Amino acid sequence: MSITKLLKSLENLSELAYVGEPVSQLEHGLQAAGLAIKAGAAEHMVLAALLHDVGHWCNPEALQMEGLGALGHESLGAEYLAAIGLQPEISALVGAHVDAKRFLAVTNAEYTRKLSAASSKTLEYQGGPMSGLELSRFKASPVFRDALRLRAWDEAAKEYKAERPDLEYYRAMLVRHCRDSVSNAQLDHWNRFGWLHIKNWYSADEMVAVTSATDDLQERPEVAGKWMKYFEVAGSDTRTLCRIENFLQYEPVYGELLQGSANLNLLSLLINERAALFKEKLNFKLPGGQGFSAHQDAPAFTTFGQRFHVTMMLSIDHGTKDNGCLEIARTPRLDDSDSLEMNEDLTLSDNAVAGFHWEPIETASGDLVLFDSYVPHRSAPNLSNVSRRALYATYNKASEGDFRQRYFSQKRGAFPPDVERENGVAYAAGVFNVGNPVSL
């Protein structure tokens, strides 16, 4: 089933009552998902909240609980979501949300007291309060704590006319969490060229939160020992913000972007094993900002003995030719056996640059561009009056180690942000500043 068909099926639930409550089945799911978003839950939990009751309608032949929905709807729903291609972490939570109810019926007298008449009746059909052995098994489940959170949203999602995102808000999120979120044609392009442009990976509505978090980081003061702000000095003595690094722990929105299951699954697919975040940066390229010289990333990523990286660029603002969008060399895929002529600063030589056809990759806000560490790339100056902000997150093979903290510790020592620099000390950028216009 396509995501469009799933959304249409959910939309039809607007006329199906949620028994014993003043909401429809659709409204109940939307409210549960909205509560998950407000709680800062991971995307797979948000989708589990949206879809936790699909088992009530996905199998017309299911046994019924005397007008109270399908018997075993949690298992039916989990099987259905797995069958239509959603990632297993979603179906696992959906399959556990009735166990959470049965657990709370034993361990929380107040919870049991507040159950509606309909919920009390369905509890009987669902096996009643857990036995001691069932309690132990459920507590040992890897989804135990998340299932309890899901249950709390389930119980609270019964308000008349509550504020919450509408159904369309979840379209892009659902696509991201499909096992086939990348098509065979896209994988073929990746394998042939080492890069991939995925349009509309995040919706305009979703990008509101990302843009707000980026605005917040942009306005934050320079603080030693925390987020790392780097500047460029162009034709005047005025410093212009060029880049921020090491910000994952300071903006929760970026936690899901960089380490949530959807993007880790995508990066793992492209890297051919589990991916681990190596480093993150925001390139701002404000109006008048300088370009980035042509280079490959691989020569700059040798510090920790890793052999292969993939970078995910999320376009926060639109990227155009006028504001200096990313440009990629159109060439068959390169690897460590392909030697390109470089300058001493590890940028590509004029001869190497002239040997490629450079393709501007214009992007809309919410698009991804992914490229491996051997893809030659560059960008031009921003000659427009609008910014071209973009998130760049680089990943390595998890088997080669988790080096994010060590990377930023070494960079802070060798090439610190302005606020941490000592007067009279000459900082050589080396591998920490290849091809970019950050001031020395």
Sequence positions of predicted segments:
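Metal-dependent phosphohydrolase cores
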Residues: M1-S181
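A short secondary-structure junction signal
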Residues: A105-T107, A162, Q290-D297, F304, ...
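Histidine-centered catalytic micro-motifs
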Residues: A49-G55, F292-P299, I328, P376-S379, ...
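Short, conserved beta-strand element in jelly-roll/cupin
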Residues: T303-K321, E362, L370, T394-S399
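Double-stranded beta-helix
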Residues: G319-A380, E400
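Non-heme Fe(II)/2-oxoglutarate
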Residues: L217-R220, K226, L368, V375-L440
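Active-site region of the double-stranded beta-helix
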Residues: E273, P299-Q306, S315-C325, T331-R333
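Non-heme Fe(II)-dependent double-stranded beta-helix
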Residues: S181-R192, I198-A294, A300
